[in-house]
């Protein structure tokens, strides 16, 4: 059972950071995990991201890298090239009926990564339905399947249709994340209690709700992407560009929640 009654420092994790200058600012602000994304297996070698990862390695922060593709051969190449602290897999696990045999390819990939790159930690996104929707995926069962080959779990929001049926309309087809929608915190709290590895709370986490998320779910860390993005002149969110004032507020709220829990 894992419930962080006596909590150490809560991990702060920010995605999607693709440039060294942005990473430098996040390090100065005090972000613990700084995540980048490789969006194409045809164009996976990106010197700016490599420089970003290398610069993070020289600090107390850790780099995390998401590959938005599944070919083991290409994933091994990017791990060789970038050498991140963490590789983060965020496949949509919701359409495999929660049967272990249906996840053998993904489990095999994670086992192989652990064998070939023992210095790289593995983060696995676990889908949780959007707040207010009927549970359509067995989050806890999925976590039990992947826990032996993972170092961290990250909760993320699975978009479902209004009928509560699963939908393929995730922002990136075949993967979960960057929805800007809050996941069901009751399920996330159950995952924290049942998991023997650290759980990072993600899914619509912002400076406005992160305090409540931490004090209710009691995760080991919190992750923000969409809600800490910059906005254009029309108020639209800009992917791959961060709003550093939002992130400063985010960090301040995290440390306040951390203090609240540790002194309760």
Feature map (PLM): residue ranges:
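Glycine-rich phosphate-binding active-site loops on the catalytic face of alpha/beta enzymes
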Residues: 31-44, 88-98, 152-162, 216-247
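Glycine-rich beta-to-alpha transition loops that act as phosphate-gripper elements at the mouths
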Residues: 10-19, 66-71, 125-132, 201-208
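A C-terminal functional module that forms or caps the active site or interfaces directly
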Residues: 200-218, 229-232
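Basic, often amphipathic N-terminal segments
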Residues: 2-60
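Conserved, mostly hydrophobic/aromatic
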Residues: 26, 87, 153, 184, ...
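Short, well-ordered alpha-helical microsegments
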Residues: 20-23, 72-75, 106, 207-211
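Conserved anion-binding
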Residues: 38-42, 57-80, 84-196
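C-terminal helical cap(s) of enzyme catalytic domains, especially alpha/beta-barrels
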Residues: 48-56, 97-113, 165-173, 225-264
């Amino acid at each position: 059972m894992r419930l962080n009654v006596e909590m150490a420092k809560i991990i702060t994790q920010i995605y999607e950071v693709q440039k060294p200058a942005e990473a430098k600012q996040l390090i100065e602000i005090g972000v613990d995990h700084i995540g980048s994304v490789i969006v194409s297996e045809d164009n996976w070698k990106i010197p700016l991201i490599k420089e970003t990862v290398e610069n993070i390695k020289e600090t107390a922060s850790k780099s995390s890298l998401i590959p938005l593709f599944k070919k083991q051969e290409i994933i091994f190449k990017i791990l060789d090239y970038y050498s991140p602290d963490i590789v983060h897999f965020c496949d949509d696990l919701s359409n495999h009926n929660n049967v272990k045999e249906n996840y053998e390819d993904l489990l095999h990939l994670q086992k192989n990564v652990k064998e070939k790159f023992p210095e790289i930690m593995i983060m696995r996104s676990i889908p949780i339905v959007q707040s207010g929707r009927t549970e359509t995926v067995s989050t806890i069962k999925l976590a039990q399947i992947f826990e032996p080959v993972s170092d961290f779990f990250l909760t993320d929001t699975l978009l479902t249709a209004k009928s509560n049926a699963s939908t393929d309309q995730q922002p990136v087809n075949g993967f979960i994340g960057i929805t800007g929608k809050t996941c069901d915190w009751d399920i996330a709290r159950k995952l924290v209690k049942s998991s023997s590895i650290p759980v990072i709370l993600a899914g619509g986490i912002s400076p406005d709700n992160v305090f409540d998320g931490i004090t209710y779910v009691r995760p080991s860390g919190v992750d923000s992407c969409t809600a800490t993005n910059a906005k254009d002149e029309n108020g639209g969110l800009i992917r791959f560009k961060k709003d550093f004032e939002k992130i400063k507020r985010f960090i301040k709220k995290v440390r306040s929640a951390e203090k609240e829990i540790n002194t309760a």
